[in-house]
């Protein structure tokens, strides 16, 4: 009986942050600037701006894909908070975003995101 309870608890932990899906985006020069034109300096801000450009301003790069999670400003603010957490992006991923125009994949989970570089 104790083993069954432990297995149930472990299964619950494993599903605590289920993957919802992913999308691919090119973080281009237009994503390095805020909507009002000032330069952004952080990778999390740039990934958030990419989603604003996709959903709100319809300024899309040819490599960009849509997503079902970051349509509103509040959802994009949540995205930025998740991107700023440890483990969301490696330091090399952050540098690639800030210093270039990489193609990224964003894996979206219930309570977190993870960003990886597909093409630098």
Can you say where each PLM-predicted feature lies in the sequence?
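Generic structural motif
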Residues: 30-32, 86, 109-111, 120
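Short, solvent-exposed loop/turn elements at domain surfaces
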Residues: 34-36, 115
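Sec/Tat signal peptide C-region and signal peptidase I cleavage site
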Residues: 10-17
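Short, exposed beta-strand-loop hairpins at the edges of beta-sheets
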Residues: 95-119
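Short N-terminal segments immediately surrounding and downstream of signal-peptide cleavage
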Residues: 17-31
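Mature extracytoplasmic domains of secretory-pathway proteins
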Residues: 37-92
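Bacterial N-terminal signal peptides
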Residues: 2-9
């Amino acid at each position: 009986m104790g083993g069954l309870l432990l297995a149930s608890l472990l299964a619950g932990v494993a599903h605590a942050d289920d993957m919802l899906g992913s999308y691919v985006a090119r973080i281009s020069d237009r994503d390095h600037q805020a909507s009002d034109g000032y330069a952004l300096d952080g990778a999390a801000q740039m990934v958030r701006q990419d989603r604003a450009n996709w959903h709100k301003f319809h300024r899309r790069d040819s490599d960009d894909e849509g997503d079902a999670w970051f349509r509103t400003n509040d959802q994009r603010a949540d995205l930025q908070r998740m991107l700023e957490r440890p483990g969301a992006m490696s330091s090399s991923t952050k540098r690639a975003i800030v210093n270039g125009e990489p193609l990224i994949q964003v894996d979206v989970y219930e309570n977190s995101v993870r960003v990886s570089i597909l093409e630098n």
